[in-house]
Amino acid sequence: MRIVKGDKVKYLNLEGVAISNPYMYITDMETYIDVYFSEVREIMTVKINSLKKVN
């Protein structure tokens, strides 16, 4: 599933397990992307393959 700007995503830990909360939203698209980390209300940059799309 392709991740695009505006998608709701979950962060995957080192074992590839999705961390359920909080949800994050894509704000920019590149190899490294900026996501809005809702619980702490800040933007953080993560690798795109560390994210899983939420339906």
Regions found by a protein language model. Give the residues of each.
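Basic/aromatic-rich interaction segments and small domains that mediate binding to polyanionic partners
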Residues: 2-55
